[in-house]
Amino acid sequence: LAGIAFSNSGLGLNHGMAHALGARFHIPHGRANGILLPYVMSFNAGCAEQLTSTAKRYARISRLLELESSSVRQSALNLIRTARRYIEKLNMPSTLQAAGVNAAEFEEAVHDMAEAALADRCTATNPRSCTAEEIEQIFRKAYSGKLP
């Protein structure tokens, strides 16, 4: 029953990337999802470039959580940063580096992980389309901890 729910829920890029990450570095799936979440949210919102319709959804959630600010961009960023803070409060690593992923092994694997994530069926339901190069950039941000 849970599998039916997951297959109908549109899990998106975060799950596709977590599948690839867990397969390569043996990070438990829930932990991989948690680490990647703020970076995928930032990509989906378009925080580093032009804002997307997803940013407006994040801003609405931000308002509901009383994280308001003066703009859609800032509201979306507040939500993303709040997600990261909750991950840290759960004593989970907030970067791949903090999760113990070796830098050289990461560099060797990042391209293949991006390709695998792009091919993952979960990725097809992501609210923003992406390329392997964009996924690779998200993995790199998740490794270093770079958020806008």
Regions found by a protein language model. Name each.
Residues 12, 84-92, 112-118:
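Short acidic alpha-helix initiation/capping motifs at coil-to-helix transition points
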Residues 24-108, 148:
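Gly/Pro-rich interdomain helix-loop hinge
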